[in-house]
Amino acid sequence: MSRPRKPKGRPISGWLILDKPLDFGSTEAVSKIKWLFKAQKAGHAGTLDPLASGMLPIALGDATKTVPYVMDGRKIYEFTVAWGEERSTDDLEGEVVRSSADRPAEEAIRALLPKYTGVIAQVPPQFSAIKIGGERAYDLAREGETVDIPAREVEVFRLSLIGSAPSLAQFEIECGKGTYVRSLARDMGRDLGCFGHIASLRRTFVAPFGEEDMVPLADLVALEKIEDEAERLAALDEHLIDTGEALSDLPHIAVNDDQAHRLRMGNPIILRGRDAPLPTPEAYATVQGKLVAIGEIAEGEFRPKRVFAG
């Protein structure tokens, strides 16, 4: 019987909040970060198109267990819409499919914003990762198929016009999971009777991470010049954010070393006293500030669902 292979790389855990440059895919970015940090595993919390820049949260090691909590968080984008053309991809990359010589007045743009605020029905772009009959919509679109993608409910918490010129308008949006900014540009262009597509897109916030957490890729690549590997990896690790920061919106309990050991073995712990937290389907436990487990609080117990190495 063969022995199980040891995973390659370092067993590090944490979040790297990358400021992704333009013309760089999300999967490519994750591979680059995994290689730089010599991490055993890595994953991202929400695709950012190659034509978009900005925040790409990348989880290393055990932090990949917390990716769903970041993917569900609010996001903020700054984007520019170019009026006069609707494109097949709803951004600069696609072919022009409709055009107009009309341009919207700033007052008309502002009057339209309330329609796209709150819970709205939105049809994702033809070139998107939505699955239709088991296949990605973008694969079908590349084969020349026009597919009927059903509308989905998404939530827009805030949509602001921050600048306007005859053929361009700059916006900022705070939105929930699953919102396509490209679809928003397409739909606003149709409503204004002039058509439109995304000319630039930058993500500046993915809850709970902010702009101050972002690290430019060039800064990380520059550390490759450090010849001593231990010194180089230590310099890279300084940019990591603790795994537990991704869970800051969940209820939290602090446990002692004995309780942490029980949780890591998959066993529940009893919560006593008048300060015991109320029942909740999800909470996280830490010992001395380090993440131990995600679980539920029920019947006076914390019951672990996912555990993290010490």
From Swiss-Prot:
The active site is at 49 (nucleophile). SUPFAM superfamilies: Pseudouridine synthase (SSF55120). GO terms for biological process: mRNA pseudouridine synthesis; tRNA pseudouridine synthesis. Keywords: Isomerase, tRNA processing. InterPro entries: PsdUridine_synth_cat_dom_sf (IPR020103), PsdUridine_synth_N (IPR002501), tRNA_psdUridine_synth_TruB (IPR014780), TruB_C (IPR032819). The keyword Isomerase applies. It catalyses: uridine(55) in tRNA = pseudouridine(55) in tRNA. Signal peptide: none annotated. Its EC number is 5.4.99.25. One of its GO terms (molecular function) is tRNA pseudouridine(55) synthase activity. Belongs to the pseudouridine synthase TruB family. Type 1 subfamily. Responsible for synthesis of pseudouridine from uracil-55 in the psi GC loop of transfer RNAs. This is tRNA pseudouridine synthase B. The lineage of its organism: Bacteria, Pseudomonadati, Pseudomonadota, Alphaproteobacteria, Hyphomicrobiales.
